[in-house]
C-alpha cells in the first residue's frame, strides 16, 4: 500500500497466518513468516512477479525474519534444542549460521545500517531487555535498564537510534533510545501498540 494507507494490493492469498513482512534494501523483495498448514516457514516474495519461495523450513517456532543491510542474508530467531537463538541464512547458498547460543529466549534481531552490529531482545537477565552485539555474536551488551519489559528493537536507518516496544503496568509503549541505551523517550502509550518499523529515511516510525 501507499504510505497514506491507500492503493492496497494483496500479495498473499489470505488463507494462512502471515507475520512480520520486511522489505529488502531495494524494496523489490519481502521476507515474511507464514504458518501455512500450521507449519512455520520463512518465505521470499518478489513484489513485481508475485513469486513466492520457501527459504527456511525449520522444525521449531520461527520468529521475525529480516534482511541484512546488503540484502544477502536473512536474520531471524527460531527454537531449537529447547531454546530460542538467533540465526542467519545466506540467501545464495542457504547456509544457516547460529549467532547466539544461550539458555534464554533471544529473538527480534535487527542489524545496524552498516551491518556490523545486531540489536535483539533477550530474557537472559531474568526478564526481557534489549541487547546489542557484534554481527558474529560476540561482545554482547545489555542497553535497556528501565522498568518493564522491552522488545522488538529495530535499528534506525540513520544509525543513531533504536526503536522498541515497552510493556509496563499493563500498557504498551513505543519508544526510542540511543544505541548505548541512553536518552530513552516513550513516544506513544496504548494497550495494543507494538513492533515499530522505521521509514527508509529514519525520520518516521
Indicate where each model-derived feature is located.
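Beta-strand C-termini and the immediately following turn/loop, strongest in propeller blades
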Residues: 1, 11-12, 30-37, 56, ...
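Multi-bladed beta-propeller domains
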Residues: 1-19, 45-63, 89-107, 133-151, ...
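A short, hydrophobic/aromatic-rich structural module that often spans a beta strand
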Residues: 16, 22-33
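Short coil/turn segments that connect the beta-strands within blades of beta-propeller domains
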Residues: 26-28, 70-72, 114-116, 158-160, ...
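Structural motif
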Residues: 38-43, 83-87, 127-131, 170-175
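A charged, solvent-exposed segment within the mature domains of Sec-exported extracytoplasmic proteins
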Residues: 63, 69-70, 77-79, 84-85, ...
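Ankyrin-repeat and related helical/solenoid repeat scaffolds used for protein-protein interactions
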Residues: 158, 165-205
Amino acid at each position: 500500500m501507499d504510505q497514506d494507507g491507500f492503493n492496497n494490493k494483496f500479495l498473499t492469498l489470505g488463507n494462512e497466518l502471515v507475520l512480520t513482512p520486511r522489505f529488502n534494501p531495494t524494496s523489490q523483495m519481502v521476507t515474511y513468516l507464514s504458518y501455512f498448514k500450521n507449519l512455520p516457514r520463512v518465505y521470499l516474495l518478489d513484489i513485481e512477479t508475485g513469486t513466492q519461495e520457501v527459504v527456511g523450513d525449520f522444525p521449531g517456532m520461527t520468529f521475525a525474519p529480516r534482511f541484512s543491510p546488503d540484502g544477502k542474508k536473512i536474520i531471524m530467531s527460531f527454537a531449537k534444542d529447547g531454546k530460542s537463538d538467533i540465526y542467519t541464512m545466506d540467501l545464495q547458498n542457504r547456509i544457516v549460521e547460529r549467532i547466539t547460543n544461550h539458555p534464554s529466549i533471544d529473538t527480534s534481531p535487527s542489524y545496524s545500517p552498516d551491518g556490523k552490529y545486531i540489536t535483539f531482545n533477550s530474557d537472559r537477565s531474568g526478564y526481557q531487555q534489549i541487547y546489542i552485539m557484534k554481527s558474529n555474536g560476540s561482545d554482547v551488551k545489555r542497553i535497556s535498564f528501565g522498568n518493564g519489559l522491552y522488545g522488538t528493537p529495530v535499528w534506525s536507518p540513520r544509525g543513531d537510534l533504536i526503536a522498541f516496544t515497552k510493556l509496563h503496568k499493563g500498557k504498551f509503549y513505543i519508544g526510542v533510545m540511543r544505541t548505548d541505551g541512553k536518552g530513552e523517550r516513550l513516544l506513544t502509550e496504548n494497550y495494543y501498540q507494538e513492533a515499530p518499523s522505521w521509514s527508509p529515511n529514519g525520520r518516521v516510525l
